[in-house]
Amino acid sequence: ISISSDFVLVRVVNVINLGRMGYLRANDVQMRHARQHLDELAGKPSSKGTNVLFLVEHTPVYTVGLRNQQYSHEDAFRLKSLGAEYYKTNRGGLITFHGPGQLVAYPVLNLQHFKPSMKWYISALENTLIKTCQKFGITARTTADTGVWVEDRKIASIGVHGSRFVTTHGCSLNSNIDLNWYKHIIPCGLHGKEVTSLTKETGQEVPLSDTISPFLSSFQEIFDCDLEYNLLEAHEMEELITNQHVLTQRMQNIQQSVRQMSTSAVHQPQAAEPIIANPMW
């Protein structure tokens, strides 16, 4: 949360583009940022959570969610023999694929700053993806099945986890991904369903880089927040991946000035929420 010059509370989300990265490395980054939120909620003195939207393009990987009983060690070996990694996760949902040409978004948010409801959160992700597709002239929708669909073809997946309304994992949108990877699995456990992409639906090449701006503007509108992003230098990115120092260091002075502003602001009846100010990309 940030405070504008006229003392209006504004939700601010950092956007950090991790580029192309393996699944485990990106997972570690988001989990450590989620821990900052949880430690702050637990009252740990030096912990300050930051609302962050991580964007990443994964190297080939199959991941399974909590309902993974149908996938055996033999299945894992078979999928890894294709040249992909394979991991079990604590997100909701069944098996899916991530790889080059797919935009993956991991919002690490304290939903107390938005709406403390996982149902609302999933709906907000769905609407963000639908609006992104609309920007490419594609009519997408939700169905009784998970994810976002173009008619009966799945173009985006959602699999999230929440702890004390702190979110991890997120969603993925197929841009120009190689759809052959999906032929080796039953995506999200849905038999007889086709997987599609922006490239396939539009009939022209849509590189992943072209999906970032439409996705971010859709996210900003649906989540009713401001986005802050700065390009990190190589050494800053490496430091971000290995520890929390980059965010913590950049936030200290800003948070102090925001708190000083808040003490002189008109009293807010529900001002128990932590104040978070954010610069990052």
Predicted regions located by residue number:
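N-terminal lobe of the biotin/lipoate ligase/transferase fold
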Residues: I1-I155, V206, E238-W281
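Short, well-ordered strand-loop elements centered on a beta-strand within folded domains, enriched
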Residues: T63, T167-H169, K183
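Short, conserved beta-strand/beta-arch hydrophobic-aromatic motifs that form part
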Residues: Q70-H73, I158-S175
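Flexible, glycine/charged-enriched surface loops at secondary-structure junctions
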Residues: T139-T143, D224-E233
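A hydrophobic, small-residue-rich beta->alpha segment in the mid-to-C-terminal subdomain
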Residues: N180-F223
